[in-house]
Each structure stands twice: as structure tokens, then as C-alpha cells.
Amino acid sequence: MTEKSSQPLLRFTHRFRVERNKVRDRKVVWLILPTVLVLVTLFVGGFLFGILQSVGYFSVIADEEQKIGFDAYFAAFQNETVRAGIILTFRVAILSTVLSTVIALAISLMISRTKRFQSTLIAITQFNIPIPHVVAATGILLTFSQSGLVSRVTNHFGITDGTSDFPIITNDPFGYGIIMSYLWKEIPFMCVLILSALRGPVTNLDETAKTLGASYSYRLRKVILPYIFPAILSGTIIVFAFSFGSYEVPYLLGEPYPSTVSVVAYQLYTDRDLANRPTAMALATITSVVIGLLVYAYMKLTQQEGRK
């Protein structure tokens, strides 16, 4: 068979493969479409219902004088409990993000410079990643509360005089217990991101700079940190977004007052006074918008890094 006579056969084979791939892709789309539709309907429907209820639609109170507007949003920021919750939420989210990033960076740099037992150290830092946050929060509560394990040990050895003498770490107004729970979970997560970045092309750049006589501190400032900074920034956005919007950890380890915004929204929603429902929905909407903006920033950042 000559080359010219084989060209139609090659074109037919190529077209057949393309069409087969299209059919396979369509089949995959149709297979996952029911699940996607259910998830999108539940999420988008609930989100839209929350927005509508926050501006006065679908009110549970029959009030002919009730107007459609943003009164619930203004009422939320005028509420002292909400203002205290906003301060606590930002404090917990910022401290958790900064501390987890700094500690994870130090651990990752130490592991990357360790030649022996590196895989063992990585496994140790990542063993608690599959553990749910609610389990971690429960463990912190059972360990560091005034009637917890550490308090009983210190009382047994005479370090503290009874459970009331043990410092308040959980269910405190500052949020120490919440921050501890986030650190225990987010440090390994940040280590995964940073270690992955440290295993990339930055290794060759670091070796080249080392060969040219650059000190480790200089390489760290001029080579390593600038290269892994996008990975660190992406991780901090994720950690901050989760810490900002999480509910179960502040509910278990926080106080009734002040509480984080997510807990305050739940308290208002379940309050016997049904007039607080729009305010609760307004808080939930604001929290969702903030988290959505953070997710959008994360996606844009990853897209820019992908182009590079």
C-alpha cells in the first residue's frame, strides 16, 4: 500500500478515534449529571433561599407591615453579640492561619534538609490529616479542659490544686482551644503543600546557588521562599477560609458569648424569637460571600501559577 493510498485510511482512523472519545465524554457527563444536579440544586437553592429570607421574603412571621430590604443586615452589625463574634472570628482565623503557616514552614524546611528518616518524619507530620475536625475538637476538649486529661495529671502530681486551678484553655473567651484545634489539623495540611513545592524545580535552583557559594540564609531568602510563596499563599487562603466559616469546632470549644459568626448565626436561627431568622440568614449570606471571594482568589492564583 502506497503512502498516498493510506492517507484516507489514516484520516478515517483519526476521525473514528475523535468521535469515540466524544461519545465517551458525553457518556461520562450523562452518568454524573444526576448527582451534580442534586448537589447544585440543594446548594444553590438553599443559598438563594437564605438570601431571599435575609431581605424579607418567605418570612415566618405574618406581618403586613414588613418591608423588603436590607434591614436584617443593618440589624446584624448593630447587634453587640454579632460584633463580638466578628472580632473573635477574625482573631481566630488570622492567628490560626499565621501560626499554622509559620510552624508548617519551619517543619517543612527542617524535613527537606534531613536526609535520614525523611519519609518517617513526613508520615508523622501527616498522620492526622484523615481525622475529621470534629474528632480533633473533641480530643482537644477531653485533653485540655479543666476536667480533662492534662488537668487530672497535673492535679495528681500536685502541680495544680484541683480542676478549678487549671488554666482555662477550652471554652474560653479568647479562643485558645479553637486555635489549638485548627493548628493540630492545619499544620499537617500546610506541610503537604510546602513539601510538595520544595520537591519541585526549586531543588535544582537551590543546589546551583549552593554550588556558587551562597549561604543557606541567602538561598532561603532569595531562592526558596520566593519560589514556594505561591504554594504558601494558596494554603493560607484555604486555611483562613475554613477557619472563618467553620461551625463545629467553635461550637464545641468556644463559649456561648462571644461566639464566632457561624455559631451566632445558628443561635439566632434557632432562637425562639422568630424575628431573628432574617438576621441569621444575613450572617450566613455574608459568611458565604466572604468564603466565596476567598475561593475565587485561590482559583485565580492557581490559574496564574498554572500559566507560569
Which sequence ranges carry the predicted segments?
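Transmembrane alpha-helical segments of polytopic membrane transport and secretion proteins
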Residues: 1-33, 116-118, 297-308
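Membrane-cytosol interface at the C-terminal ends of specific transmembrane alpha-helices
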Residues: 164-210
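Interhelical loop and adjacent transmembrane-helix boundary motif
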Residues: 22-27, 73-75, 244, 251-293, ...
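Short membrane-interfacial helix/loop motifs at transmembrane-helix boundaries
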Residues: 43-80, 148, 157, 254-256, ...
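Transmembrane alpha-helices
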Residues: 34-44, 127, 131, 180, ...
